[in-house]
Amino acid sequence: MPRREKGVPMQFKNILVPFDESEHAQAALHLAIDLAGDDPDAVINIITIVSSDIMPPSMISSTGVLGETPIDYGSYETLLTSMAERADRELHDSLAGLLGKDMDTIMARLAIETRLAPSPVDGISSYAADHRCDLIIMGRRGLGALRGMLGSVSYGVLRSSDIPVLTVK
C-alpha cells in the first residue's frame, strides 16, 4: 500500500487501533502510523480491552453467599483493577518493543489506554464514540464463513460501528 504523500492533509484525524499484541493488531498499528504520516493533527488511539464479565453475576455478591464459589464485590473489583493494571503494563511494554526508537517521535500523537468493558466489542465501540474517533483500524482473524474470516471481535465492531472500520491481516 502506498504511503500518503508528505504535506497532503489526512482525511482521518482520530484513528482508533484496538491492540491485543497479535500479528494482525501489529499490522493495524503500523498501517495507522503510515496513514497518519507527518500530519501533526492526527491522533492514534491505541486501546486494549480487559473483559469485566469474567465471572457470572451469580458468583458475585455483596454478602458472599451466592453462587458455588462466591466472591464479594470488593474482591471482584480488586481483581479487575489488578488485571487492568497488568494489561496496561503489557500494552506499554509491547508498544515500546514494537515501535522501538520510533516511539519517541510519535509518542505525542499516541493516546494509549486500557479499558474495562463487558466485551471487547463493547469496549471498542464505546471508546470510539466517547473519543469521537473517525476511523477504526483493527486486525482480523478466524476461519470459516464471513463471520469466521473476520473473527468475532472485528465482525462485532463492523456490525455495531457508525464509523468506517478497516480490517487488516
Identify the function of each model-found stretch.
Residues 71-83, 110:
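Short glycine/proline- and acidic residue-enriched helix-loop micro-motifs
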Residues 160-169:
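Short, flexible loop segments at boundaries between secondary-structure elements
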Residues 2-10, 51, 93-135:
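Structural beta-alpha unit
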Residues 48, 139-141, 169:
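Short secondary-structure boundary segments
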Residues 135-156:
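Glycine-rich, Arg-bearing micro-motifs that act as flexible, cationic patches
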Residues 7-76:
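Small/aliphatic-rich secondary-structure junction motif
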Residues 45-47, 111-115, 166:
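General small-molecule cofactor/ligand-binding pocket signal
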